[in-house]
Design a protein with these regions (language model features):
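Active-site rim/adjacent substrate-binding subdomains
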Residues: 1-105, 117, 121-126, 132
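Catalytic glutamate of the conserved HExxH
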Residues: 109, 113-117
Length: 132
């Protein structure tokens, strides 16, 4: 049994942690997203669970939503916001089970949600995660 007491952060505290983690990511990576809007919820909405055909709301830690590079740079630029959703309860469960730092988990979720959306390879995302 661990000697560490895990104190669950509030929604606001987790959002602050995500903003700090995002600010420490490489500038070139952050530039992919444009202005990022952060949403932290305890669980994903039912439509997200249904659209992604998830078995459980604990099956997803985060979700990126926004235009891709082609939509943002074409002749008819899409002006929809770039958003990242972080799901607090699944993140906290993962944190308690895996024993990784919460900061590391949040950074990992950010890098992978943004990276997958923009077509980065696993190797590229791993390099971004290691740059700090």
């Amino acid at each position: 049994m661990r000697d560490i007491e895990l104190l669950a952060p509030s929604l606001d505290q987790l959002e602050a942690l995500a903003r700090e983690a995002f600010a420490r990511l490489p500038q070139e990576f952050r530039d992919l997203t444009g202005d990022m809007v952060f949403f932290v919820q305890d669980f994903p909405e039912d439509d997200v669970i249904n659209d992604l055909e998830l078995d459980s709301p604990y099956d997803i830690l985060g979700l990126f939503s926004g235009p891709d590079l082609a939509e943002r740079s074409g002749a008819f630029q899409v002006s929809s916001p770039t958003m990242i959703f972080l799901y607090r309860r699944p993140i906290l469960d993962y944190w308690a089970e895996e024993g990784e730092s919460l900061e590391h988990i949040v950074r990992h979720v950010l890098v992978h949600e943004i990276g997958h959306h923009f077509g980065l390879s696993d190797e590229q995302m791993e390099a971004i995660e290691e740059s700090d």
